[in-house]
Amino acid sequence: MTAPDTDREEFVSLAGDADGPVVTHLVADLDVSVDPLAAYTTLADRSDYGFLLESAEKVSSSNPQGAFSAPATAADSHARFSFVGYDPEAVVTVGPDGVDVTDLGGPAAEFVGAGDGDVLDSLRGALPDLPRVNFPETDRQTLTGGLVGFLAYEAVYDLWLDEVGRERPDTDDPDAEFVLTTRTLSFDHREDAVRLVCTPVVSPDDDPGEVYDGVVAEAERVAEKLRAADDPAPGGFERTGEDAGSREEYEAAVRKTKEHVRDGDIYQGVISRTRKLRGQVDPVGLYASLREVNPSPYMFLLRHGDRRVVGASPETLVSVRGDRVVVNPIAGTCQRGSGPVEDRRLAGELLADAKERAEHTMLVDLGRNDVRRVSTPGSVRVEDFMSIIKYSHVQHIESTVSGTLDADADAFDATRATFPAGTLTGAPKVRAMEIIDDLEAEPRGVYGGGVGYYSWTGDADVAIVIRTATVDSGGADDAITVRAGAGIVADSDPTAEYEETEQKMGGVLDAVRRIEYGTEEASQ
C-alpha cells in the first residue's frame, strides 16, 4: 500500500475536529521513476485541462560556456521541483463579462467564489478561503494545490487602462483562466522522489476516513499508471503557412515610440510583434523540443481545452514565499557567442553599453517602486544587481528586487502591484501601456501576461509570459503564435530593435524547426 505521510487515525482526528469545511493536506511517496513529461502525457494530456511546470537552474557569468542545466538534474532551490497537475476540480475564467466557473467535479468546486472587483479580486474569490488542516509549516518550496493558469496581458485594461478611458480590444480571449487543482505530482529532483500531493476538501458531512482511503487508492492508481508509462513519442509539425508581420510597420512603430520618448511622454516603451505559423503540430513535441533547446527557470505546458500554452520564460513576474516578495527585472540583451571567448566579449560589451545600463537601471527602479507598494517600509532590497545570465540564444542583464510583504497584503495584491512587468511595457507604465494600445495592431493575448500558481498556503510563483508559443487547435489547421518585443529609448535603431525581436523569438522558432525538420536539419 502507498501510505500518505500522515497516518489514518491522526488524519481522521484532525479533519474530524473541524467545525466546518476545511482543506486538508496529504502527501504520498509513489516510489516510481518517471520523467515529468511522461507523467504529464500519461495523466494530464488526455483530458481538457492539465499542466506541467518545470524549472532549470540559472547559470551566471561565472560559467561563461553553459546556458542552463537540464531540469532533471537541477538542485538549486528554484529548479528543485517539477509539477504535473491533472483532473482539476474547477476552471475559473475571468473576462470582461465577469467570472465563469466550470465545475469539473469534486467537493472543492462548490466552494469556488466569484469575488467582487477586478480580475485579481475575482481570482482571490475563486480560491476557497477555507481553514487549512495538516499543512506543513516550514517547507514552502512546493506547490500544495490551488489555482494554476494564466493571466493575459489584456487584464491591464481592467487593472489600469479603464481609469484613463481606454477600451479593451475586441477579443474572445479571457483576461485570466486558472484551474483549481487538488491533485499534483511533485518531482523532487534533489531527492529523486515523486510524490502525490493531495489537498482534498473535507466537509462536516464527509467521513474523513473515506477521504483518507480515497487518497490512498488514488496514490496506488497513479503509481501503477506511472510504472507502466512509456516515454512520450512526440510528433512533429507540418507547416501550411506563416505570417511574420510587416517589418516596415514594426520599424515605423519604433520610430513613433522614439518620438514619444523625445517628447517626454515616456522614458522607454516596449513594442512587440508576432509571428504566426499554421499547420498540424503536436504541442507535447513542441514543449519537449523547447525544453531541450532553451531550458529556462520557468518552463510550462498548460492545456486549456483547445489551447496549449508552451513556454520557457526566464523572468519572474512576482514570487511570494511567506512574507517575502520578489521580482526579477531583465533588460539588456545580446546574442550568444560561438564559443566562450566570444561569449565573454559580447557579455562585456553588453555591460559596458551605456544605453543598456541606463535602461536596466530604470527598470530596476520601477521594480523597486512596484515591490515597495506592498512591502513594509525600509524592507525593499536590490540583489544580484546586473548579473549576466545566459540562455540558448541570448544573454541578458538581470537583477533581483525583494521586499517583506506587508501584513495587510497577499499574493494577489503583490501581483496587482507588479503587473504588468515594466520590462514588457516601459516606463512610466500607464502612459507606456497607452502607447502600446495605440501602436500595436492586435491584442497581445498571453504574451506579456503571467503563468503560474496561487497556492492554498498563500504563496505564489508567477512568470512573465515571454519565449512562449500558444497553440490553438480545433480548426482545419493548428495556429502557433509567437511574440516578442524590444525596449525602445531615444537612441534606438529601428533595424536593430527588429533584429532583437527575432533573437528573442529564436529559441521558440528553433524548437518549432526541430520538430518540423528534425535536429540535424534545424541546426544547419
From Swiss-Prot:
Domain of life: Archaea
Record carries keyword Cytoplasm: no
Cofactor(s), by name: Mg(2+)
A biological-process GO annotation: L-tryptophan biosynthetic process
Binding residues for chorismate: G332, T333, Y447, R467, G485, A486, G487
Binding, L-tryptophan: S55, P297, Y298, M299
Assigned EC number: 4.1.3.27
Activity modulation notes: Feedback inhibited by tryptophan.
Gene Ontology MF: a single term: metal ion binding
One Pfam family of this chain: Anth_synt_I_N
Catalytic activity: chorismate + L-glutamine = anthranilate + pyruvate + L-glutamate + H(+)
InterPro entries (UniProt xref): ADC_synthase, Anth_synth_I-like, Anth_synth_I_N, Anthranilate_synth_I_arc_typ, Chorismate_C
Top-level EC class as recorded in UniProt: lyase
Free-text comment on the cofactor: Binds 1 Mg(2+) ion per subunit.
Pathways involved: Amino-acid biosynthesis; L-tryptophan biosynthesis; L-tryptophan from chorismate: step 1/5
Residues binding Mg(2+), per UniProt: E359, E500
Entry's family note: Belongs to the anthranilate synthase component I family.
PANTHER family: AMINOBENZOATE/ANTHRANILATE SYNTHASE, ANTHRANILATE SYNTHASE COMPONENT 1
Assembly notes: Heterotetramer consisting of two non-identical subunits: a beta subunit (TrpG) and a large alpha subunit (TrpE).
Name of this protein: Anthranilate synthase component 1
